């Protein structure tokens, strides 16, 4: 520890005592028989008198009154703005509630419309299936009729051809005469 401070040593303390052994008394300055504290009081009274004469308190109170009026106006404006904000908040809250109700009503209406469309589509599809089924049945019955008519026509043609062949084979001119005579006799 190379840099340690050394303690300060002084000479032996000397005792000094004060005694009032006829020392002269200190006189304070005075002017016009007034002490300094009295002059301070007079100066303050003069300052206050000048302030009152120049109407400083009324200026201060007027300034304070103006500031109070300004603050009151700001407070009134703030109250009006707050009331307007609360009114707008209530209005928008009501609008949001109405919008939610409208949205719910729209959703309910959309559900009903979707159900109605679904029911109509089911009914239409059933009707379409029935129509197609009837058309198929009609086509089948028409095809059956055509087939029956064709079979009948073929059978009639075959019967006529067979009859002609049989008549041609078994009937001769004499048999024709005999048949014609019988038919005439019946008439």
Curated annotation (Swiss-Prot):
Gene Ontology CC annotation, any one: proton-transporting ATP synthase complex
One MF term in GO for this entry? proton-transporting ATPase activity, rotational mechanism
How does the UniProt record describe the way this protein sits in the membrane?
Single-pass membrane protein
Could you tell me the keywords of this UniProt record?
ATP synthesis, Cell inner membrane, Cell membrane, CF(0), Hydrogen ion transport, Ion transport, Membrane, Transmembrane, Transmembrane helix, Transport
For whether the record's keyword set contains Transmembrane, the answer is yes
User: What residues form the membrane-spanning segments?
Assistant: 36-53
Q: Which InterPro entries match?
A: ATP_synth_b/b'su_bac/chlpt, ATP_synthase_B_chain
Where located?
Cell inner membrane
User: What functional role does this protein have?
Assistant: F(1)F(0) ATP synthase produces ATP from ADP in the presence of a proton or sodium gradient. F-type ATPases consist of two structural domains, F(1) containing the extramembraneous catalytic core and F(0) containing the membrane proton channel, linked together by a central stalk and a peripheral stalk. During catalysis, ATP synthesis in the catalytic domain of F(1) is coupled via a rotary mechanism of the central stalk subunits to proton translocation.
Q: Which family does it belong to?
A: Belongs to the ATPase B chain family.
Subunit (UniProt) = F-type ATPases have 2 components, F(1) - the catalytic core - and F(0) - the membrane proton channel. F(1) has five subunits: alpha(3), beta(3), gamma(1), delta(1), epsilon(1). F(0) has four main subunits: a(1), b(2) and c(10-14). The alpha and beta chains form an alternating ring which encloses part of the gamma chain. F(1) is attached to F(0) by a central stalk formed by the gamma and epsilon chains, while a peripheral stalk is formed by the delta and b chains.
HAMAP family per the UniProt record, alphabetical: ATP_synth_b_bprime
The name of this protein is ATP synthase subunit b
């Amino acid at each position: 520890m190379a840099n340690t401070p050394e303690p300060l040593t002084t000479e032996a303390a000397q005792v000094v005592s004060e005694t009032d052994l006829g020392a002269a008394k200190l006189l304070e300055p005075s002017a016009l028989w007034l002490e300094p504290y009295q002059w301070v009081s007079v100066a303050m009274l003069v300052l206050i008198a000048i302030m009152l004469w120049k109407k400083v308190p009324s200026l201060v109170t007027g300034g304070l009154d103006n500031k109070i009026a300004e603050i009151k106006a700001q407070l009134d404006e703030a109250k009006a703005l707050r009331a307007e904000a609360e009114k707008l908040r209530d209005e928008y809250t009501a609008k949001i509630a109405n919008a939610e109700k409208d949205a719910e009503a729209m959703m309910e209406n959309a559900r009903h419309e979707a159900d109605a469309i679904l029911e109509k589509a089911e009914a239409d599809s059933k009707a379409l299936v029935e129509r197609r089924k009837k058309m198929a049945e009609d086509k089948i019955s028409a095809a059956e009729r055509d087939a029956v008519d064709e079979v009948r026509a073929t059978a009639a043609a075959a019967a006529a051809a067979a009859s002609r062949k049989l008549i041609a084979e078994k009937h001769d001119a004499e048999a024709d005469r005999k048949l014609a005579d019988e038919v005439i006799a019946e008439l």
